[in-house]
A protein has these predicted regions:
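Extended, charge-rich alpha-helical interface modules
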Residues: 2-109
């Protein structure tokens, strides 16, 4: 997959003429890999939402939000936070995703 064009300041990527917030460049692979995996899995499941009930759809949408916040693509822009705040946010969103995974397994959903 090719690397998308970035704005001069590096804060945004350009895809099909649209500007999207870029992933936080300070995040290490140990954080980005599981966040990207969670994002991809949730999006894939949402693509089959006709097979899901409202609660399942809401849970998956929340997972997308948490993953994108962790990556710095949503929420407070990463360039407005300190590096420590950016890393803490990514770790927090990973923890939220992991807790939700445990609740889903325990609840049988």
């Amino acid at each position: 997959m090719s690397t998308p064009e970035r704005t001069a300041d590096g804060r945004y990527i350009i895809v099909k003429g649209r500007r999207w917030r870029a992933q936080d460049p300070v995040l290490p692979e140990a954080l980005t890999a599981p966040l990207l995996s969670a994002l991809g899995t949730a999006r894939s499941r949402l693509s089959r939402r006709h097979q899901l009930n409202d609660e399942q759809t809401a849970v998956l949408r929340q997972r997308v939000t948490w993953a994108k916040e962790g990556l710095g693509e949503r929420g407070t822009p990463w360039w407005e936070l300190t590096e420590d705040e950016r890393l803490a946010r990514a770790r927090d969103r990973l923890e939220r995703l992991a807790r939700r995974d445990g609740a889903v397994r325990e609840g049988g959903r």
